[in-house]
Amino acid sequence: LKPNSDYFIINYKNITENINNHYFPEYYLSKELGIDIYIIDSESTINQIKNAYQHIVKYKNVYKIHLIDGGCDSLLSGKESHLATPTEDMIHMRAVMDIDVSQKIISCVGMTCDCNQLPKNELIYRLNEINDILIDTHIWNKNDKYVKKYYDIFYKCQPRRSIVNSLI
């Protein structure tokens, strides 16, 4: 299903081919959560990404956008070296800035996975410097039911093919 040329919708029920030997985490995520997964092409321009978000917000009556960064590139200042995928993260953050929703959140999962040369405390300090931006810091506990669910789902999404998920 592709209701707009700027994004795709993945619903595991619509995929009939055997995908066992293919890296397709969106399929597994859709299957495990029982929901549609929206994919915006990583080769898209900022305007195409913004159009995709605007269309999804309107089409699904979205009131909150929650971006999730695997790692912490979205928290960096640009002065760091050996970055992972900061361009992709920054493009999505910029595109979402202009979207009219009541709440916008970004979460960094696996904060020290790709930014290990910069201490986590330094990143948190930077966020505290900017008023009203840091909502919460949370260290995951494997006994927490939601953390267990995360591990369960992402293990099925073939985390060995994702640097961040394999390190979390």
Predicted segments, located by residue:
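Generic structural signal for well-ordered, non-membrane alpha-helical segments
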Residues: 18, 22, 26, 46-49, ...
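Structural signal for hydrophobic packing residues in well-ordered secondary-structure cores
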Residues: 33, 37, 57-60, 96-100, ...
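Internal, conserved structured core segments that host functional sites
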Residues: 33-96
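Short, solvent-exposed amphipathic alpha-helical segments in soluble enzyme
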Residues: 82-83, 121-125
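Short, flexible loop segments at boundaries between secondary-structure elements
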Residues: 94-111
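Glycine-rich, charge-decorated loop segments at or immediately adjacent to ligand/cofactor-binding or catalytic sites
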Residues: 106-108, 112-123
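A conserved mid-domain beta-alpha-beta active-site/ligand-binding segment of alpha/beta enzyme cores
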Residues: 123-168
